């Protein structure tokens, strides 16, 4: 289990990572509706992560030691899961960006993009639930 400071650092790192992904994905928005949806979902994830970061910083010291330990443990798992999803999407985005036939590559990667979108939705829901628990 990590401490509060390490978790704050992990959240900040994930926010920076998502912002970078968002920039790369924005270059691909016009290739397909899946790429456009990916940009939208990454933007929402970025907002959710910023909200979680703010709520976590404001309220983590207000809860009991037991509640704090549970919150740290569960939120760490959520952040790691979200990071794994983003890493997989980064790989897909990079394959499309490096392709000479971006539109064709985007179509070939459509299934992976859709799967990533489903995972992002699940990750965001989990983070929102966690945020509701924190407050």
Residue ranges and their predicted role:
Residues 1-70, 74, 89, 96, ...:
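N-terminal amphipathic alpha-helical segments
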Residues 5, 79, 116-117:
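A generic alpha-helix preference that emphasizes hydrophobic side chains
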Residues 43, 100-135:
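Regulatory helix-to-disordered linker/tail regions at the edges of structured cores
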Residues 77-91:
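Elongated alpha-helical scaffolds
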């Amino acid at each position: 289990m990590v401490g509060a400071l390490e978790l704050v650092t992990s959240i900040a790192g994930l926010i920076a990572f998502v912002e970078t992904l968002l920039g790369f994905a924005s270059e691909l928005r016009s290739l397909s509706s899946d790429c456009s949806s990916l940009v939208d979902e990454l933007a929402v994830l970025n907002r959710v992560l910023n909200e979680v970061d703010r709520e976590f910083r404001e309220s983590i010291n207000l809860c009991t030691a037991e509640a704090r330990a549970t919150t740290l443990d569960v939120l760490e798992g959520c952040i790691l899961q979200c990071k794994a999803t983003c890493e997989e999407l980064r790989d897909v985005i990079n394959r499309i960006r490096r392709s000479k036939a971006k539109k064709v590559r985007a179509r070939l990667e459509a299934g992976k993009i859709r799967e990533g979108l489903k995972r992002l939705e699940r990750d965001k829901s989990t983070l929102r639930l966690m945020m509701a628990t924190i407050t």
